[in-house]
Design a protein with these regions (language model features):
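Aromatic-enriched
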Residues: 35, 326-399
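Small-residue packing motifs within transmembrane alpha-helices
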Residues: 14, 160-167, 194, 317, ...
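Transmembrane helices and adjacent periplasmic/lumenal helix-loop junctions
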Residues: 168-186, 307-317
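A cytosolic-side transmembrane-helix exit/cap motif
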Residues: 145-146, 165, 215-222, 312-320, ...
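Primarily membrane-embedded glycan-assembly and transfer machineries that use lipid-linked glycans
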Residues: 2-163, 188-312, 392
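Hydrophobic core segments of transmembrane alpha-helices in multi-pass, intramembrane catalytic enzymes
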Residues: 141-150, 176-179, 314-323, 372-379
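Alpha-helical transmembrane segments in multipass membrane proteins, preferentially the mid-helix core
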Residues: 278-281, 316-329
């Protein structure tokens, strides 16, 4: 069956837009709108986000339970209150809808900024699309996080280290994950500027919330945030023991299959970190696009599959990594490489949808954190390819 028509353009008024781009934004709008019209109970995550701003300005502990406002607890840093502020002051449902669309647009923008050729760009969007909808159904912040990580790489490539450092610092002070962007220091032509800008933005965004709260409260809030993250890690492991929706990670798979629920994450994360570091010995490839993009892909995947906080909507970050990994593969694709991508699309992305049998989803995929498995397989392949990078080098024009 020929699917080349997917890469065609359609005309909207005076403008031409690709079918995939059109579907990306239409589905995003429909997805967010469908949650908004179901009522406040369906946008609980957004209520948590809104609460960060409201509690920051009223100087209430950001990390306590507020059952009269929302369910669950907040685990985002105080800087997040500034990002959500413009939406929080809007009428609830309008703010929520625009928040969801911002996430869809920002990830789209980041993917476009990778400057792949048109077909490859659309392939990345297509691979990410189902997972984006999963995240938007939960009005999550994860597409924004994926975009920050991608842009931290893009801006290093564009020699705009001040912007790369800004993405890393702001992301770190809201949800930690974008700290992986510091690896792109290796690819910078202005390493001193990269470090200095990083220090500047870290201090800037750390203190910026004082414009809406007091210095004393902000200082205490950082201690509260740290404690909430420690508590969250412990709760994730408890959730894993119950076969819940948290700890959808490599460690979660190990804990759930082995039923050794006190299995320590460091037995996985430290070896994983070492495997990520080992290919850095190939210094002569630091300027090579394939090498850089492979690193971008495994860092996006690592952020999720080695986090005990990972849940299904978090996987838009990892799947963005899978999409980048696919683009750098040498053609013609081997059966093994094609099978790995199909495995990820089916078990990671489609398993969260109603297209997947509920019995299998509930009794196997969720119970054993199997959503992480295809991304882990691709992560292993990506690390292996980085170690043998000389066999992967492509002409940059192929992207």
């Amino acid at each position: 069956m020929n699917f080349n028509w997917l890469f065609n353009d359609i005309k909207i008024g005076k403008y031409k837009v690709s079918i995939i781009t059109f579907v990306w934004f239409v589905l995003s709008a429909v997805t967010v709108f469908s949650e908004v019209i179901r009522g406040a109970h369906s946008i609980n995550n957004y209520l948590v986000y809104k609460g960060v701003y409201e509690h920051l300005i009223s100087q209430q502990n950001l990390y306590l339970a507020y059952p009269n406002e929302y369910f669950d607890l907040n685990h985002y840093g105080p800087a997040f209150g500034l990002l959500i502020a413009p939406f929080a002051i809007m009428p609830l449902f309008i703010g929520c809808f625009l928040w969801g669309m911002l996430n869809a647009w920002f990830l789209y923008y980041a993917i476009i900024k990778l400057r792949f050729n048109k077909k490859n760009t659309l392939i990345v969007l297509l691979i990410c699309m189902v997972e984006l909808m999963t995240s938007l159904h939960n009005v999550q912040y994860n597409p924004f996080i994926a975009a920050l990580i991608i842009l931290s790489y893009v801006f290093v490539k564009e020699e705009k280290d001040w912007l790369a450092a800004m993405c890393i610092a702001f992301g770190f002070l809201t949800k930690l994950y974008p700290i992986v962007g510091i690896f792109f220091f290796l690819f910078s032509n202005h390493k001193v500027k990269f470090v200095l800008w990083g220090m500047f933005w870290l201090i800037f965004f750390a203190v910026l919330p004082v414009i809406i709260t007091s210095h004393e409260f902000l200082h205490q809030t950082y201690f509260d945030w740290w404690q909430s993250l420690v508590d969250k890690t412990n709760q994730n492991i408890v959730c894993s023991a119950a076969g819940g929706m948290q700890d959808i990670s490599v460690m979660g798979m190990i804990r759930r299959f082995s039923k050794v629920y006190d299995f320590r994450s460091i037995w996985v994360t430290i070896p994983a970190m070492l495997l990520i570091i080992v290919p850095m010995k190939n210094i002569r490839f630091y300027k090579d696009s394939t090498y850089q993009l492979l690193y971008l892909s495994i860092l996006l995947i690592s952020t999720v599959i080695f986090s005990s906080s990972a849940e299904s909507p978090t996987y838009i970050i990892a799947v963005a990594g899978v999409a980048v990994w696919w683009i750098v593969q040498v053609k013609p694709y081997t059966t093994f490489i094609m099978s790995a991508l199909i495995f990820a699309i089916v078990l990671t992305s489609l398993s969260a949808t109603d297209l997947f049998p509920h019995y299998i989803k509930d009794h196997f995929i969720t119970t054993y954190s199997l959503k992480a498995l295809p991304c882990f397989v691709i992560w292993i392949i990506g690390v292996y390819q980085l170690m043998g990078i000389k066999n992967m080098v492509k002409n940059p024009t192929e992207y």
